[in-house]
């Protein structure tokens, strides 16, 4: 399998930033965006293809985490924190806890968790 | 009607697939106050969020009290809260095996953060339980030959309380004083060690003033005098590099919810070579090597393990960032306000915990004025009483300065905007409160407050 090309890494970077912006919690959102930018910037001069592949794999795993966690944090209603101007728009309503008055765990979430 | 609602929901889901365009985190910090509109659970309605929204919650600047869960930690915990719910001590079926595998993996993650062997990690319900096990367990095991313990005056309440309860059992405890900087005097420690001392307990990073004790030196002293060394590392684990072998630590307490893990879980490190014997506090089925019976809560320990792993990876990045933000906070406050004192040694100090005393301002009133920021004066466990913190008293702070101290916490998720906002509000309110203060007026007129003879009525 060929090592990840520059284009693939950039696609991954863009996808991660895009997904991170969907966190409704201000602190998680700002952390994710900042961390992703800093991590990709820090590793931009890595030349060893094995190391690049390791980093790309880790980034893919983290992208999966962000995809799973964003809807969870949006689905649970909570008042926005300090610096937000408006309650962040909610993604497709899938929450795990029935007690919060939300629907059944979405098959999308369960699929992601490989359950 | 139902059909239309369902169609609308589906339409939102489709258009929301690439991610709804979020309102970018704002630069202009307008805190809007609206009424508490009851939130309906239908997502379609909130896509067009009303301008008059709910009251915004305060900024969180109290990370020494507790920390939010890192999303990576929650992601690791969820499968064990949903489907993999087996008891890790069930030996006969797959539910038990997979739960046990997760527990052992978490143990390995915790151990590698502190340089220990996984067999030396025992899961508990938190650092308070770990401290109790360490102090009472060691003291009681060696009760026949050793009756003396040493600790400091700035320890966490659970350590001080455990020592007090041991005193009631007939043990002797020396509470070492600390210097003005908050650090103990190593010569005093050496002088306090007696032939019948079983344990020295000194916390690594203080939760109120952020002072770092010289753990490596204390470890060296204790191991040379053959005394066990316990450290409450709840505020230090995952934030500064710790190695139990380099620092000659025999027992260490770890707390889950201080390192972006779940609440209700912690761990205790108990050295095996040379073996530290501990009398178990909690009797039962012999789980956790007999030292802490009870079913190990798999989702919580998986969370603790994940938090430790994330902390290990992020330690350098977080430390650099937190140091920068902390510098920014202190510099900006101190250059705009006179008569601000930072409690604790500025050099041997963990940057994320900043304790400032604002002279001529009452701490509680400043806290209430800063209602948009979640802060604390002193530690959460003592915040209910009106007494000034015993830690500040131990470092020799004047009574009036002790009453006016505020603890700012900077953590992994704190942003520069939050720090700037906190600084701005703090300066504004301190100035306003000082304007109202007659003491401040007198100081401005050049009167030395210490020379005043207050009359009795």
Curated annotation (Swiss-Prot), chain B:
Its cofactor is pyridoxal 5'-phosphate. The keyword Zinc applies. InterPro entries: Aminotrans_V_dom, Aminotrans_V_PyrdxlP_BS, Cys_deSase_IscS, Cysteine_dSase, PyrdxlP-dep_Trfase, PyrdxlP-dep_Trfase_major, PyrdxlP-dep_Trfase_small. GO terms for cellular component: centrosome; cytosol; mitochondrial [2Fe-2S] assembly complex; mitochondrion; nucleus. Pyridoxal 5'-phosphate binds at residues 127-128, 235, 255, 257, 295. N-gluconoylated. This is Cysteine desulfurase. It comes from Pongo abelii (Sumatran orangutan).
